[in-house]
Amino acid sequence: MAVPFYLPEGGADDVASSSSGASGNSSPHNHPLPSSASSSVSSSGVSSASASSASSSSSASSDGASSAASQSPNTTTSSATQTPMQSPLPTDQVLYALYEWVRMYQSQQSAPQIFQYPPPSPSCNFTGGDVFFPHGHPNPNSNPHPRTPRTSVSFSSGEEYNFFRQQQPQPHPSYPAPSTPQPMPPQSAPPMHCSHSYPQQSAHMMPHHSAPFGMGGTYYAGYTPPPTPNTASAGTSSSSAAFGWHGHPHSPFTSTSTPLSAPVAPKMRLQRSQSDAARRKRLTSTGEDEREYQSDHEATWDEFGDRYDNFTAGRERLQEFNGRIPPRKKKSSNSHSSSSNNPVCHTDSQPGGTSQAESGAIHGHISQQRQVERERQKAKAEKKKPQSFTWPTVVTVFVLAMGCGFFAAR
């Protein structure tokens, strides 16, 4: 049976509940229903969860409407939350709330079993589904009487509430895990509870608790974690227990990094490890190795590029190709493309014993050829220049003359 609960700060009057419904916490369970009405709504939502989302929303609303009408004969509009104790809400809001609720149920029941964990949360970088409360054993320190969960997470200002509302991972009803990770409390404050939901709560409590937070928010792009039954893989619970995360289920997040840097961290770590490996490889070789091409363990392109840079450092830095360039014919396109296809092949295939002097001579030859080429191209460009220079001048003069003519005519 679903348990109705009230907004803590709003005072639970009609104005607060309707405004919360308008502000996007669209769920029929924000509003103080009588328990029978809310249970009928939840049962209709469960029964219609297997149908398509649009039809199921309409059927759920009609079911709820019929049950509400049977309770109070004076209500005629088809609204599931319209009870005598409340001012009526506009029907489209209620329909939208029901639709969201049913879609949440559906996505939880038919979610593909691809990922085993909810996505990384911005405010808590524990990934396992059962971090704070291991599935098998109920939490020893939890209160015997769980408090009614609250829709607002006791922030001081509403902006923070909205910020965290967008980035909630969507919990599954059978998770005893935290549905709303709270932001890091100040370190001087007494430890906040890491989650609102305790293992003793019924599974119906969770949809109430998570529905106000939208469908997973924009941050996760509609991803809802697949249902993990209470008998979750023992591997995850035991491995996360091995790291000692279960020891302090109520302590503040002392081990979390700054909220938004958590998703970025693995990528940075990967890049750093790769570059470290390359640097280590480079440092193991001797200095002479770097200068001459006699090393037997020329492994990566990285190292190859580094050594190549080392012994071409003294020469001109801006080179057209690394390889040897055959003298060009008049039609430069064919040979140009063929030589650009294998830029490194010639220097790569030098025998291991070529000394630095030989390679230096080769490079001197290449640079001479290159200078000759450049001079040729400069000469060509200078020939072309007068022709190409006359056209723009002619055009600009013509345009200016036309403009002056227009002005004079005015």
UniProtKB/Swiss-Prot annotation:
Q: What is the effect of changing residue 180 to A?
A: In Ala5: Induces apoptosis
Q: Where is the composition biased (Low complexity)?
A: 13-27, 35-70, 134-145, 230-242
Q: What is the effect of changing residue 121 to A?
A: In Ala5: Induces apoptosis
Positions where Phosphoserine occurs in the chain: 295
Impact when changing residue 171 to S = In allele A22
Q: Which GO MF terms are attached to this record?
A: BIR domain binding; cysteine-type endopeptidase regulator activity involved in apoptotic process; protein sequestering activity; ubiquitin protein ligase binding
Q: Name one GO biological process term.
A: larval midgut cell programmed cell death
Where is the segment annotated Disordered? 1-88, 126-207, 230-301, 319-386
Task: List the biased-composition ranges (Pro residues).
Answer: 170-189
Q: Which domain of life is it from?
A: Eukaryota
**Polar residues bias spans:** 71-88, 149-159, 343-358
Q: What keywords are assigned to this protein?
A: Apoptosis, Developmental protein, Phosphoprotein
Q: Residue spans with biased composition (Basic and acidic residues)?
A: 292-301, 371-380
* Disruption outcome: Mutants contain extra cells in the head owing to decreased levels of cell death and show a pronounced defect in the morphogenetic movements of head involution. Ectopic expression in the retina results in complete eye ablation. Reduces levels of caspace-3 after exposure to ionizing radiation. Simultaneous knockout of hid and Clbn/NEMF has a similar response to single mutants after exposure to ionizing radiation.
One Gene Ontology cellular component term attached to this UniProt record is:
mitochondrion
What does the subunit comment say? Answer: Interacts with Diap2 (via BIR2 and BIR3 domains).
Family affiliation: To D.melanogaster grim and rpr.
The function of this protein is: Activator of apoptosis, with grim and rpr, that acts on the effector Dredd. Seems to act genetically upstream of baculoviral anti-apoptotic p35. Blocks Diap2 from binding and inactivating the effector caspase Drice. Might regulate apoptosis downstream of Clbn/NEMF.
- Any idea what this protein is called? Cell death protein hid
- Organism in which the protein naturally occurs: Drosophila melanogaster
